[in-house]
């Protein structure tokens, strides 16, 4: 048996395959199905598991461009700007960051031109947003 805790083994199985059945997770984590169910229910209730998602290869999506956008925000307008960014349909994910930018956003649009329009017309139009630095995703490597 692994030195990882039961919770860590269950979470690792879910991170590898969010669609895995309780039976598959139980086998991988070396616990019973009821134990898996109990842990998952508790982790969801505690807000540790906040959702399940699919990993998407952007190159296989026809007619869609994806960029990770570093966003700089005036400190005094951070909360409101963040709320507004969260409401944009084209922003698929938004993260606070300790790197070069205060926020990192995954932005999707029909193509590169549309993505540029979203950044200039929507993201940069938000009060408090001082700069946006897009990096267009080319190929998923892992």
UniProtKB/Swiss-Prot annotation:
PROSITE patterns referenced in this protein's UniProt entry, alphabetically: HTH_ASNC_2 (PS50956)
Alphabetical GO biological process terms: response to amino acid
Signal peptide residue numbers: none
Molecular functions per Gene Ontology: sequence-specific DNA binding
Entry keyword annotation includes Magnesium: no
Induction of the gene: Transcripts accumulate during exponential growth. Is also subject to negative autoregulation.
Name this protein carries in UniProt: HTH-type transcriptional regulator LrpA1
Organism, scientific name: Halobacterium salinarum (strain ATCC 29341 / DSM 671 / R1)
Gene that specifies this protein: lrpA1
